[in-house]
Amino acid sequence: MSALRTKLDSLIAQTDLDVSEKQREQLVGYVELLDKWNKAYNLTSVRDPLEMLVKHILDSIVVGTHLQGERFIDVGTGPGLPGIPLAIMHPEKTFFLLDSLGKRIRFIKQVVHTLGLKNVTPIQSRVEEFQPEEKFDGVLSRAFASMTDMVEWCHHLPKEQDGVFLALKGQHPKDEMDLLPEWCSVTEIISLAVPELEGDRHLVILSRKEN
C-alpha cells in the first residue's frame, strides 16, 4: 500500500466519514495527478502530496454532510477544490467546477477522464459572465477573499427559493458578516473538524433574505 493511501486511511479513521475502497483509490489518484501537474503548472502552493491529503482532501470532504440538494457549482475552483473531492464522495450529486484559467480547467478535464468521474462538468469562465441553463442548490467556494465578493459576484447562480451560498473559511468570519449586503444573511456557521489541520475551519451558509 502506498504512503499516500496509508496516510489517507489514517486521516479518514479520525472522522465519521464512510469512504468506500473505490473512493479512497480515486482520492489518492487525484492527489497523484495534482502532484504531477503541479510541478509544471503551479496549481497549488502545497508541494507535499501528504500535506495535500490534509489541506485539500480532508478539508474538502468534511463539508459533504452539509450539502443539501443535488446540483452544485464550485466557483474559483482552482485545481478542483473542494469540487473534485466532493464529487468523488457524492456520486449521486452533480458538480460544476468553474475557473477562468485554462490550465486549471485542462487539469480538471484530465482528472475527470483519468478517474472516470461522471458527475463533474468543468467550465472555463469568469463567474460574473457565466449564465447557467439551470440554477444551483448550492454555490461553493473556498477561493474568495470575502463573502461579500462571493455573494455579489455569484448572486445569479443559486436557485431563487432554496439556493444557498457555502463559503469555506478559516477563522470565524464575524468581521466579514458585518459587511454583507442587505439582501443576504448568514443562516448557519458550522465549525469543521479537519484531522491534523492547524487552525480553525468554518463553513458559512448564506442565503437570500425572505422578501
Curated annotation (Swiss-Prot):
Keywords associated with the record: Cytoplasm, Methyltransferase, rRNA processing, S-adenosyl-L-methionine, Transferase
Give the reaction(s) catalysed: guanosine(527) in 16S rRNA + S-adenosyl-L-methionine = N(7)-methylguanosine(527) in 16S rRNA + S-adenosyl-L-homocysteine
List, in alphabetical order, the Gene Ontology terms for molecular function in this entry.
Answer: rRNA (guanine-N7-)-methyltransferase activity
* Gene Ontology CC annotations of this record: cytosol
Enzyme Commission designation:
2.1.1.170
Q: Where does S-adenosyl-L-methionine bind?
A: G76, L81, V127, E128, R142
Task: Extract the Pfam families matched here.
Answer: GidB
Please indicate which superkingdom the organism of origin belongs to. Answer: Bacteria
The principal location of this protein is cytoplasm
Family annotation (InterPro entries): rRNA_ssu_MeTfrase_G (IPR003682), SAM-dependent_MTases_sf (IPR029063)
Where is this protein found? Cytoplasm
Extract the NCBIfam families matched here: rsmG_gidB
Q: Which HAMAP family match?
A: 16SrRNA_methyltr_G
Q: Which family does it belong to?
A: Belongs to the methyltransferase superfamily. RNA methyltransferase RsmG family.
What does the record give as the function of this protein? Specifically methylates the N7 position of guanine in position 527 of 16S rRNA.
Q: What is this protein called?
A: Ribosomal RNA small subunit methyltransferase G
Organism lineage string: Bacteria, Pseudomonadati, Pseudomonadota, Gammaproteobacteria, Vibrionales
